Amino acid sequence: MSVNQKFEKTGSIAYLCDEYLKNNFIDPEASERLGVKRGLRNPDGTGVLAGLTNVCDVVGYDLVDGKRVPTDGKLIYRGIDVEQIVRAAYAEDRFVFEEVIWLLLFGSLPTPHQLASFKQVLEAHRELPKDFAEDMIMKAPSPNIMNKMARSVLALYSYDDNPEEQSLTNILSQSIALIASLPTIMVNAYQIKRRVYDRQSMYLHLPQPGQSTAEHILSTYRADQKFTKEEAKLLDLCLVLHADHGGGNNSTFACRVLSSSGTDTYSAISAAIGSLKGPKHGGANHKVMEMLGYIMEGVKDHSDDTEIAAFLRRILRKEAGDGSGLIYGMGHAVYTKSDPRAVILRRNAEHLAVEKGFEDEFRVLCAVERLGPDAVREVKGTKDVCANVDLFSGLIYRMLGISEDLFTPLFAISRIPGWCAHRVEEVVFANRIMRPAYKYLGHEQEYIPLEERG
């Protein structure tokens, strides 16, 4: 019996909702009046400084005389511009996500010997514990892969003979094992979801030796286990660009908050997955693909900038699209002139888009990137808006034949190295539980004995 069915049997939830709304209200204007930093953001849009980190920096503006000045965006992993990492990967024709994992965790670039050894360690941890897939995934499937991934991470606590210890040795061991095994959990959860909820055939492939993380995902996801190197490199690029985004993004901050309490690695990473599952954080590329469908249908000439710009203005006026008034894939809390991840994805995805028959869709998204800022300025009066990484990532996954069920889970696979790096840093160096304040606004009332209540 579902939760809703139980309420239908025992009493109406609508009555309880009415009771809540009758007795609870917070005036939105009270936050400004009392100096509350809603969303932990300052009035100028900058984030409230909540901690220190060596892991990652996100640069989207300069502060000049206390004011934000737009600048081209940069994403910095341990002091290295991600643009440099990506250019090296393509120049040397190799996969670099594993190198980025090392860089984020340890703060240095691995030597060839260190990288080769580290890849072997990751490969050794890809296979799940004995009977784990059967007991923890098959017997309790979920229609939502993020939900199943979070539950599976928590379940791995029971397979660890020392889950609670907070030593650097233990946390790093747990982190590396989770980074390696989470892609296998994701694909297993998806295949079983296909079988149980979609009534389609499932394919459970074992990890193959000598593969990068991107190759491992494609070979276990696809029925025939076949893929091209160009496909795997584009997925590797997506993993690299999503690997971290500073300590203040919602899921990483959630991981750091839990880590500050002294809880175990499995609880902290599961909480981060739960945060990323939220549509305000990790689900935007779904909405971009939905919006792209509206544009492809509503615009007659997909090469006509004037027609596309007019349609974007209609979206902003809530006359087209899903009625939200939002151009999905546009705007970011930090980036102002450009999101380097979007720039890099656009630059490297075009060839495969043409090859896979998605040239029209790709060019429409490029037009949205180009025309969107002016449309937002004209309709909303908002300045400093640029395309973000979500504008192109969803189409890339579709080009790779990846189900939308896995769009956000792939984000989690990408981001877990960052989560783990921030967890280690929080435990080793911060060593103080996070405990911000909340202002009480409730009114006083007298306790009334039960028999006297009307």
Language-model-derived ranges and their functions:
Residues 1-454:
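Non-transmembrane, aqueous-exposed alpha-helical and coiled segments at domain scale
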